[in-house]
Amino acid sequence: MRRKTNIFWIIFSCSTLCFLSLIGVFLRIHQSKPTLASYSSAPVVIIDAGHGGMDGGAIGVDGQIEKEINLSIALKLDTMLRAYGFQTIMTRDSDVSIHSPDAKTVRQQKTSDLRNRLKLLEDTSSGILISIHQNKYSQSSAHGTQVFYGKNCPESKELAEMLQKTITGYLQPENTREIKQATKDIYILYQATKPAVMVECGFLSNAAEADKLTDEEYQDQIAFSICTALMNCLADQS
């Protein structure tokens, strides 16, 4: 009987120590995690789900449609940022183009759509834009996230660097792509006077990556990486 009692107390003690250790780990992680209250001034995050409506964007090797993937990731990111207390604005939260009513032709509608997205950023006090897109290339071997940034604001490059580092570190350790400054072909980033970045999450021309980009769990991981990168970048700047 005494032996059974000793064994019980040994098991109980070990279990208690393990439990306390887990609590300690949790508290260290929780305390080190950036919170909105730690930032000197929190931006209004404009989440831009690229394309929409009549503009489907890139089409994947198995028929995946870019605009749908963009919106799915953007909605997930919106939910995460709001959970952390951020104020967010989505350029679209459904399958629509946001062109002005007087735009009649497809060309006019696409141009108007881009201008309205840019205007939303420029009209938002303390606005910062994160645009979600997917890539496509003639060579199916091309893969990996790549982040582009606007040229008119130093914070854009800082955020792009943190995004690239976080996404590749968490999801794509083999990805050696580097961030790029946007050219005039990326209208919103090129014209923006406020912080603006575009996350090309992956290549729809790569069959394996296209499959991942349509996977809900992988989309959650992409959105989480973007959310984490933004918070870490703001913490560094504060």
Per-region residue spans from a language model:
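Catalytic-site microenvironment of enzymes
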Residues: 1-238
